[in-house]
């Protein structure tokens, strides 16, 4: 059995310990993660998937009634059914966090309002959706804080609904009434997002991190002969290409708790932000930049990255660090 989200092939002994066929089905569909003792942890849905469901529901409700869930295609390529509530021209989706107890956006309601149009599709973001307070390498001041993957997911959901209803065009507005309040519990303001939450999600799923699952990840890493730890799905994809003979494991922000358990050679591979802030938490101090992504546009970045490599390697000589950009090119290698 393979996890369709991460690509991890579950060991037979783990599968044999999971005797509930319903739970096995959830795992095979990517809706849950199987742990080393045979129990499962359910994945939740990202803000991007939740907003997509609300948007699709709002468009469908222009011509349809009597439905309480919609089908959306996640960025991971997995189609899921997400519960919604509707009124004519309005769709709402309450964000489901799965078995991730630390999800501060759990339960947040996304609302979408759809208005028929003569042609084309218009998408706008309103109250509770954060906006960038300054220019960044990928966004301009005032742009909604919606990642590229989430934006594509939302637009695809709207287009599916337009095709299903047969209407010539539509205008959709997405908002989250409690978004500004919830955003106060996040790091948005530190990275330059104000007025609400970010709409994110590289896979469409929220990983069910807890102490139990962390131990399972440790078990996987300890038993692997050659291991690459990644910080996210993009890093995972490129790590598989760069290191095809290694076991690639999604560690997320748990690098610091997993690496001490490993005694052999280890590779950390991922995008700059999480990797560099893990190996050198103070890399941005004195730079005048708030994010690693912004720092990357400055001539001081590459020397700072090399210095960070040297400092970390002096304490962890068995760990190699490989930093890639969003196109998969290696921009830094401690080897």
Curated annotation (Swiss-Prot):
Catalysed reactions, as listed in the record: Co-precorrin-5B + S-adenosyl-L-methionine = Co-precorrin-6A + S-adenosyl-L-homocysteine
The UniProt record lists the keyword S-adenosyl-L-methionine: yes
InterPro entries documented for this protein: CbiD, CbiD_sf
This enzyme's EC code(s): 2.1.1.195
Gene3D superfamilies reported for this sequence: CbiD-like, CbiD-like domains
Domain of life: Archaea
Annotated GO biological process: anaerobic cobalamin biosynthetic process; methylation
Protein name: Cobalt-precorrin-5B C(1)-methyltransferase
Species the sequence originates in: Methanospirillum hungatei JF-1 (strain ATCC 27890 / DSM 864 / NBRC 100397 / JF-1)
């Amino acid at each position: 059995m393979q996890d369709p989200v991460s690509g991890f092939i579950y060991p037979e002994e783990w599968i044999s310990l999971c005797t509930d066929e319903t739970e096995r089905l959830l795992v095979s569909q990517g809706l849950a993660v199987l742990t080393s003792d045979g129990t499962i942890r359910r994945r939740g849905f990202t803000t991007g998937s939740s907003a997509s469901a609300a948007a699709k529901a709002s468009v469908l409700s222009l011509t349809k009634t009597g439905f309480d869930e919609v089908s959306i295609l996640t960025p991971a390529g997995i189609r899921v059914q997400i519960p919604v509530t509707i009124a004519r021209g309005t769709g709402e989706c309450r964000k489901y966090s799965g078995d991730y107890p630390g999800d501060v956006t759990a339960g947040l309601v996304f609302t979408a309002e759809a208005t028929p149009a003569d042609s084309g599709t218009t998408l706008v973001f309103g109250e509770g959706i954060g906006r960038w307070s300054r220019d960044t390498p990928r966004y301009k001041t005032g742009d909604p804080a919606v990642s590229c993957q989430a934006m594509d997911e939302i637009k695809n959901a709207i287009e599916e609904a337009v095709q299903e209803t047969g209407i010539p065009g539509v205008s959709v507005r997405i908002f989250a009434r409690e978004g500004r309040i919830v955003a106060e519990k996040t790091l948005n303001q530190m990275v330059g997002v104000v007025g609400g939450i970010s709409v994110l999600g590289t896979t469409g799923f929220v990983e069910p991190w807890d102490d139990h699952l962390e131990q399972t990840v440790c078990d996987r890493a300890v038993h692997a002969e050659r291991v690459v730890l990644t910080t996210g799905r993009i890093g995972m994809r490129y790590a598989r290409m760069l290191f095809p003979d290694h076991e690639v494991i999604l560690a997320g922000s748990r690098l610091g708790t997993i690496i001490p358990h490993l005694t052999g050679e280890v590779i950390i591979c991922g995008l700059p932000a999480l990797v560099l802030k893990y190996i050198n938490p103070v890399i941005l101090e004195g730079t005048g930049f708030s994010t690693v992504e912004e720092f990357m546009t400055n001539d001081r970045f590459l020397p700072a990255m090399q210095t960070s490599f040297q400092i970390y390697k002096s304490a962890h000589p068995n760990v190699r660090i490989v930093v890639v950009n969003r196109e998969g090119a290696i921009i830094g290698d401690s080897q």
